[in-house]
Structures are given as C-alpha cells and as structure tokens.
Amino acid sequence: MTRKSIQEREKKRIKLAKTFLKKRKELKKIISDPNIGNDIRWNAVLKLQSLPRDSSLSRQRNRCSQTSRPHAFLRKFGLSRIKLREAAMRGEIPGLRKSSW
C-alpha cells in the first residue's frame, strides 16, 4: 500500500486539474494560434506559467484503485496487474479468462 500522504497528494492534483482545466485550455489555445500578436501570446504564456504546477494533467499519475500502486497499471480496469490477476482468478471480472494456447 502507498503511504496516505502520497494518496492525498494525488487527490489534490486531480482536484486542482479540474479547477484550472478551462483556464488552461483557453491559454493554450491562445498560445498555439499563429494569427494572434506576439505580445498577447507572450502574456498568455506568462499567465500559464503563473498557474499552479500541479494543475497540469501531466502531473497526475495513474494508480491502482485498490492498492494505489503506480506501476503496471491497466487503464481499462483501473487496477494494477497483480490485483487484476487476483480478481480474474476469482471470476470477479466478467468476460475475462486466463489465456491458454
């Protein structure tokens, strides 16, 4: 299990990202538009840099919903490979079977 502080930090990042998502998108749209003047684009870059670092989506880490394990995470199930295997062996995931060839 991951430490509680790391789990809380991740929750905080998710909350911050939701809060600033719209503003971040608007600023990135201004920055990427070549028809806007350089001074306006530069101001947009400065505003984007002034936003909290943790409000960026790339700062988030996908974690297992049961153990908060960051590695070997499968997006489709929201679990790490270890917990996915355990759940599959117990038959808790519909349509998932152990392969055999």
From Swiss-Prot:
GO terms for biological process: translation. It holds the Pfam family Ribosomal_S14. Disulfide bonds: none annotated. PROSITE patterns: RIBOSOMAL_S14. GO terms for molecular function: rRNA binding; structural constituent of ribosome. NCBIfam families: PRK08881.1. Gene3D superfamilies: 1.10.287.1480. Binds 16S rRNA, required for the assembly of 30S particles and may also be responsible for determining the conformation of the 16S rRNA at the A site. GO terms for cellular component: cytoplasm; small ribosomal subunit. HAMAP family: Ribosomal_uS14_1. InterPro entries: Ribosomal_uS14, Ribosomal_uS14_bac/plastid, Ribosomal_uS14_CS. Belongs to the universal ribosomal protein uS14 family. Part of the 30S ribosomal subunit. Contacts proteins S3 and S10. This is Small ribosomal subunit protein uS14. Keywords: Ribonucleoprotein, Ribosomal protein, RNA-binding, rRNA-binding.
